[in-house]
């Protein structure tokens, strides 16, 4: 919100001229390339393929994060070393998170069931309802999502960070 207001003040001369458009991960790049939005200021990972293939400009990194996992405390899992083949994992589709999950589980030699959603609250709610063994996204997102679960203290973010996520705004 502050980044968007600052851009509006600098470019348009008025911080109140900003218009916010909620977008899913799947919609974000299309909205930017089509001109529906001018600046994509959400948790978007700057990757080589996105930098080279999409034709958009990442203007800098404003936050470094990393992907992790949240599980129920009563699952007995203390780290990703406790993961087993066949477990289900909730996450957002069309994201680096989905790709990192696939790479991570393949490297561990584990089959898993992807339970994918376009919106973070759908993934969180499905995990919270017990329909996934784990929930994965950036660790800052896990910390935030944990606070809105019915019983936050019944869930734990595992210690491993499986990726480095340079996040920042994107423009045409």
Region spans (language model):
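Bilobed "Venus flytrap"/periplasmic-binding protein-like clamshell domains
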Residues: 1-11, 44-48, 65-124, 139-143
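Loop/turn elements at helix/coil->beta-strand transitions in domains of secreted/extracellular proteins
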Residues: 14-17, 36-38, 85-87, 110-112, ...
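A short acidic, often aromatic-flanked loop/helix-cap motif at beta-alpha or helix-coil junctions
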Residues: 28-29, 121-124, 164
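Short glycine/serine/threonine-biased micro-segments
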Residues: 33, 92, 166
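Alpha-helical segments with a strong preference for the paired helices of cellulosomal dockerin domains
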Residues: 34-36, 125, 129
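A short beta-strand structural signal in non-transmembrane regions
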Residues: 166-172
């Amino acid at each position: 919100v502050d980044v968007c207001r600052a851009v509006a003040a600098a470019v348009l001369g008025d911080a109140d001229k900003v218009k916010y458009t909620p977008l899913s991960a799947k919609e974000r790049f299309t909205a930017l390339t089509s001109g529906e939005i001018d600046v994509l200021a959400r948790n978007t990972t700057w990757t080589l393929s996105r930098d080279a293939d999409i034709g958009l400009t990442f203007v800098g990194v404003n936050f470094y994060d990393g992907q992790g996992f949240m599980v129920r405390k009563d699952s007995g899992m203390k780290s990703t070393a406790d993961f087993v083949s066949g477990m289900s994992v909730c996450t957002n589709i069309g994201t680096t998170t989905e790709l990192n999950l696939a790479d991570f589980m393949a490297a561990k030699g584990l089959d898993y069931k992807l339970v994918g959603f376009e919106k973070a609250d759908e993934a969180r709610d499905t995990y919270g309802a017990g329909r996934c063994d784990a929930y994965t996204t950036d660790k800052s997102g896990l910390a935030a999502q944990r606070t809105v679960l019915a019983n936050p203290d019944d869930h734990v973010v595992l210690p491993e960070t499986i990726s480095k996520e340079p996040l920042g705004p994107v423009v045409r």
